[in-house]
């Protein structure tokens, strides 16, 4: 198995799930936690690129503080041949305490690159960030677990955060004031 670093992104107010750290430590000797109070970041991509830059290994697994690796995913990563530049991983979302198996938030539809070689990739995107990979992308089959929103209030806070990011990154055009 290749050496992997785990980069965990957390807001300054978030509580890191114990499962997040426990699962990260099962695949890595290098766990990096970056909060938005460490530096002022304009967007999530900047924060995730910063976290990857602090990782000591070339292979980086990206987690948010409200995510953890399923035991099946841990085993799959440990047996991986690392022949690709990156790997996409499905995500099983829990919203209001319930797993989501339908819509765009189902594991079949919510699949992204979260395991990547940082020498062959980087994060881009203002709000819904994604990894740009220079090379081929493999697919893992077992999901990481994501506890999105426990309450409606958390859901609304996230929407507000996304709209704030969008507003900060919009190019001002005075013509639209008159249309």
Language-model regions: role of each:
Residues 1-26:
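N-proximal low-complexity "stem/linker" segments adjacent to membrane-targeting elements
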Residues 16-19, 37, 72-73:
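Acidic helix N-cap motif at the loop->helix transition within catalytic regions
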Residues 29:
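Receiver (REC) domain switch/active-site residues of two-component response regulators
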Residues 32:
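Conserved beta-strand positions in the Rossmann-like core of class I SAM-dependent methyltransferases
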Residues 35-36, 64:
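Acidic ATP/Mg2+-coordinating residue in the GHKL
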Residues 37-44:
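Short, acidic/glycine-rich phosphate-metal binding loop used to engage nucleotide
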Residues 44-53, 59, 63, 70-179:
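Catalytic-site signature of metal-activated, phosphate-bearing donor transferases
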